[in-house]
Curated annotation (Swiss-Prot):
<dbReference type="GO" id="GO:0004850">
    <property type="term" value="F:uridine phosphorylase activity"/>
</dbReference>
<dbReference type="GO" id="GO:0009032">
    <property type="term" value="F:thymidine phosphorylase activity"/>
</dbReference>
<dbReference type="InterPro" id="IPR014710">
    <property type="entry name" value="RmlC-like_jellyroll"/>
</dbReference>
<dbReference type="Pfam" id="PF06865">
    <property type="entry name" value="Ppnp"/>
</dbReference>
<comment type="similarity">
    <text>Belongs to the nucleoside phosphorylase PpnP family.</text>
</comment>
<dbReference type="GO" id="GO:0047975">
    <property type="term" value="F:guanosine phosphorylase activity"/>
</dbReference>
<dbReference type="InterPro" id="IPR011051">
    <property type="entry name" value="RmlC_Cupin_sf"/>
</dbReference>
<keyword id="KW-0328">Glycosyltransferase</keyword>
<dbReference type="GO" id="GO:0004731">
    <property type="term" value="F:purine-nucleoside phosphorylase activity"/>
</dbReference>
<keyword id="KW-0808">Transferase</keyword>
<dbReference type="GO" id="GO:0005829">
    <property type="term" value="C:cytosol"/>
</dbReference>
<comment type="function">
    <text>Catalyzes the phosphorolysis of diverse nucleosides, yielding D-ribose 1-phosphate and the respective free bases. Can use uridine, adenosine, guanosine, cytidine, thymidine, inosine and xanthosine as substrates. Also catalyzes the reverse reactions.</text>
</comment>
<protein>
    <recommendedName>
        <fullName>Pyrimidine/purine nucleoside phosphorylase</fullName>
        <ecNumber>2.4.2.1</ecNumber>
        <ecNumber>2.4.2.2</ecNumber>
    </recommendedName>
</protein>
<dbReference type="InterPro" id="IPR009664">
    <property type="entry name" value="Ppnp"/>
</dbReference>
Length: 103
Protein backbone atom coordinates (compact mmCIF):
# COMPACT_ATOMS: atom_id res chain seq x y z
CA UNK A 1 0.00 0.00 0.00
CA UNK A 2 1.47 3.38 -0.94
CA UNK A 3 -0.78 5.47 1.31
CA UNK A 4 -1.41 5.12 5.05
CA UNK A 5 -4.65 6.77 6.17
CA UNK A 6 -5.96 7.79 9.61
CA UNK A 7 -2.61 7.54 11.36
CA UNK A 8 -0.66 9.27 14.10
CA UNK A 9 3.04 9.92 13.45
CA UNK A 10 5.79 10.36 16.01
CA UNK A 11 7.43 13.78 15.64
CA UNK A 12 10.78 12.45 16.79
CA UNK A 13 12.76 10.32 14.36
CA UNK A 14 14.56 7.11 15.26
CA UNK A 15 18.16 7.81 14.23
CA UNK A 16 20.74 5.03 13.76
CA UNK A 17 24.30 4.72 12.49
CA UNK A 18 25.24 8.40 12.91
CA UNK A 19 22.20 9.56 10.95
CA UNK A 20 22.65 7.23 8.00
CA UNK A 21 19.42 5.40 8.85
CA UNK A 22 16.32 7.25 10.05
CA UNK A 23 12.73 6.17 10.58
CA UNK A 24 9.47 7.49 11.97
CA UNK A 25 6.94 5.49 13.94
CA UNK A 26 3.43 5.47 12.50
CA UNK A 27 0.47 4.32 14.59
CA UNK A 28 -2.54 3.06 12.64
CA UNK A 29 -6.19 3.41 13.63
CA UNK A 30 -6.33 -0.29 14.61
CA UNK A 31 -3.54 0.25 17.15
CA UNK A 32 -0.80 -1.40 15.13
CA UNK A 33 2.57 0.25 14.53
CA UNK A 34 4.74 0.58 11.44
CA UNK A 35 7.96 2.43 10.80
CA UNK A 36 8.83 4.31 7.62
CA UNK A 37 12.55 4.62 7.05
CA UNK A 38 15.26 6.03 4.82
CA UNK A 39 18.65 4.34 4.48
CA UNK A 40 21.70 6.11 3.05
CA UNK A 41 24.27 4.02 1.15
CA UNK A 42 26.23 1.64 3.36
CA UNK A 43 26.10 -1.69 5.17
CA UNK A 44 24.20 -2.05 8.44
CA UNK A 45 23.31 -4.77 10.95
CA UNK A 46 19.98 -4.74 12.76
CA UNK A 47 18.34 -6.90 15.41
CA UNK A 48 14.65 -7.58 15.87
CA UNK A 49 12.74 -7.73 19.13
CA UNK A 50 9.55 -8.98 17.46
CA UNK A 51 8.59 -10.39 14.09
CA UNK A 52 8.72 -7.93 11.20
CA UNK A 53 7.84 -7.64 7.54
CA UNK A 54 10.16 -5.26 5.70
CA UNK A 55 8.76 -3.84 2.46
CA UNK A 56 11.11 -1.94 0.14
CA UNK A 57 9.23 1.21 -0.91
CA UNK A 58 11.96 2.75 -3.09
CA UNK A 59 15.38 1.72 -4.29
CA UNK A 60 16.85 -1.66 -3.46
CA UNK A 61 18.62 -3.50 -0.67
CA UNK A 62 20.84 -6.52 -0.55
CA UNK A 63 19.91 -8.48 2.57
CA UNK A 64 21.80 -11.14 4.49
CA UNK A 65 18.99 -12.95 6.26
CA UNK A 66 19.54 -14.81 9.55
CA UNK A 67 21.37 -18.12 9.14
CA UNK A 68 22.11 -17.37 5.48
CA UNK A 69 25.49 -16.94 3.82
CA UNK A 70 24.10 -15.54 0.55
CA UNK A 71 23.03 -11.93 0.06
CA UNK A 72 19.59 -11.60 -1.57
CA UNK A 73 18.37 -8.57 -3.50
CA UNK A 74 15.03 -6.93 -2.68
CA UNK A 75 13.84 -4.05 -4.83
CA UNK A 76 10.91 -1.63 -4.71
CA UNK A 77 7.63 -3.48 -4.14
CA UNK A 78 9.22 -6.60 -2.64
CA UNK A 79 9.38 -7.65 1.00
CA UNK A 80 10.99 -10.09 3.39
CA UNK A 81 9.94 -11.43 6.78
CA UNK A 82 12.02 -11.67 9.93
CA UNK A 83 11.37 -13.62 13.12
CA UNK A 84 11.69 -12.11 16.58
CA UNK A 85 15.13 -11.93 18.21
CA UNK A 86 17.27 -12.34 15.11
CA UNK A 87 19.98 -10.24 13.47
CA UNK A 88 20.26 -9.44 9.78
CA UNK A 89 22.34 -7.19 7.54
CA UNK A 90 21.37 -4.84 4.75
CA UNK A 91 23.52 -2.98 2.27
CA UNK A 92 22.72 -0.52 -0.48
CA UNK A 93 24.62 1.66 -2.92
CA UNK A 94 21.95 4.38 -3.26
CA UNK A 95 19.32 5.89 -0.98
CA UNK A 96 16.50 3.41 -0.33
CA UNK A 97 13.30 3.46 1.72
CA UNK A 98 11.29 0.88 3.61
CA UNK A 99 8.09 0.28 5.53
CA UNK A 100 8.38 -2.09 8.48
CA UNK A 101 5.23 -3.79 9.79
CA UNK A 102 5.39 -5.60 13.11
CA UNK A 103 3.89 -9.06 13.58
Amino acid sequence: MSLLEQVSVSKKANIYFDGKVASRSVFLADGSKQTLGVVLPGEYEFSTSQGEVMEVTSGRFEVLLPESTVWQEFSEGTQFELAANVSFKIRNTAIAEYCCSYL
